[in-house]
């Protein structure tokens, strides 16, 4: 499965009532812009994303981190955290608490800068 999560600009934000868990509900309007990451999940190491050409343009350095549960490859904009703190890996761990999943091969070509207010 390949997806292209778009960057987005927040056009409006309204903080509403406080919830019992201490967080607040939000009303917001997002506008997608034509900048996106490329994300691929597979159960097969032979898929295009895990070949040298993969989802990564030629010449882009690719980092790889593997455990018994997943192989995570990333290239493009540097992800400034250990793989275990990456939201993709945290989400995968939460899903694995409820579902038996095979070893997953995850590739991320990061193009949306983190912390830039673009949803990256």
What do these predicted ranges mean?
Residues 1-115:
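ATP-binding N-lobe of GHMP and related small-molecule kinases
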Residues 118-120:
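DPxDG-like acidic metal-binding loop motif
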């Amino acid at each position: 499965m390949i997806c292209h999560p778009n960057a987005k600009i927040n056009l409006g934000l309204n903080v509403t009532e406080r919830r019992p868990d201490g967080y607040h509900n939000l009303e917001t309007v997002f506008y997608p812009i034509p900048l996106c990451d490329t994300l691929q999940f597979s159960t097969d190491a032979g898929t295009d994303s895990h070949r040298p050409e993969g989802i990564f343009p030629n010449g882009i350095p690719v980092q790889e981190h593997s455990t018994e549960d997943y192989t995570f490859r990333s290239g493009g904009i540097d992800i400034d955290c250990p793989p275990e703190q990456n939201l993709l890996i945290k989400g995968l761990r939460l899903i694995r608490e409820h579902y038996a999943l095979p070893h997953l091969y995850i590739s991320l070509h990061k193009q949306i800068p983190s912390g830039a207010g673009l949803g990256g």
